[in-house]
Design a protein with these regions (language model features):
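Acidic/His-leaning functional-site neighborhoods
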Residues: 157, 161-254
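HotDog/MaoC-like acyl-thioester-processing domains
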Residues: 2-9, 64-146, 207, 211-213, ...
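Hot-dog-fold acyl-thioester-processing enzymes
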Residues: 1-60, 107-109, 116-201
Length: 258
């Protein structure tokens, strides 16, 4: 029986959740991680429904996912999640990604903040949920991947393209969805980079600011090594008065291929 500290979400990798090579898509993987996190929180009284009643919402601040082998179509995957630590403004949530036979596909680390829906300011988790969280913390659970590092700002000459945030980018928090950023980032690479068994094996992503419907997202990419890249996404309003100096850094991330 699963302990009260952990929650497992089991899914089958259906054809429409795979890429052209029949691998589980990173977008579907990312959404499943978020769904597992919400299921864990909801079953313990601090899910989106609960915090929305307090005019608050959970937002993802950091996400690091490392995949040793990507599941393929028809595989059944168990995504298990637990809370490692709680701090004043953030909480650490980890994940394991395994097959039904115990095969380890990968792990993930994430950092979340609870913000006021109106002011967008982070709330004090220790005051709101400190005692409640105590029984759910599982720092003893193994998550054997290194924590993500920092990515420095990229130069303007690393610019690749601009895109406009559209209807399908926006989630219930009214901003561009965290997993949609991953989709846009992966589209910076041609399909040939994902052929012949090559795939992204690790992503470290920091969500730094919010962006909204019709914002212009500028994507920058820099090659660090043969299989390592850094990406930055900046945002600005879609009007003629916006300048480079008025752009906000939305996302910085590091990608590893193998």
């Amino acid at each position: 029986m699963e302990s009260n500290k952990k929650q497992t979400l089991s899914i089958k990798v259906d054809p429409f959740n795979t890429d052209f090579a029949k691998r589980w898509s990173w977008m579907s993987l990312g959404k499943t991680l978020l769904n597992a996190a919400e299921l864990h929180a909801k079953n313990r009284g601090f899910g989106m429904y609960n915090v929305n009643s307090e005019n608050c919402t959970w937002v993802l601040s950091r996400l690091c996912v490392e995949i040793f082998e990507m599941p393929v179509v028809w595989d059944t995957v168990n995504v298990c999640t637990w809370i490692e630590n709680i701090y004043r403004l953030f909480t650490d949530r980890n994940f394991s990604i395994k097959g039904t036979d115990g095969k380890v596909y990968g792990y993930a680390r994430s950092i979340w903040a609870l913000i006021d829906y109106t002011t967008r300011e982070p709330q004090n988790l220790e005051q709101m949920y400190g005692d409640d969280f105590g029984g759910f913390l599982a720092p003893e659970e193994e998550c054997p991947i290194r924590k993500q590092g920092r990515v420095k700002p990229l130069d303007n000459d690393c610019w690749v393209k601009d895109i406009k945030s559209e209807y399908s980018d926006i989630d219930l928090n009214g901003h561009v969805n965290s997993i949609k950023y991953i989709e846009h980032i992966m589209d910076l690479f041609p399909m040939s980079d994902y052929e012949n068994g090559r795939n992204m094996s690790r992503i470290e992503i920091a969500y730094m600011s919010e962006s909204y419907y019709s914002d212009i997202l500028s994507l920058y990419k820099k090659k660090i090594d043969d299989d390592v890249y850094e990406v930055e996404v900046r945002g600005r309003k879609d009007d003629s008065d916006s300048t480079l100096s008025q752009m906000n850094t939305l996302v910085r991330c590091k990608l590893f291929f193998k």
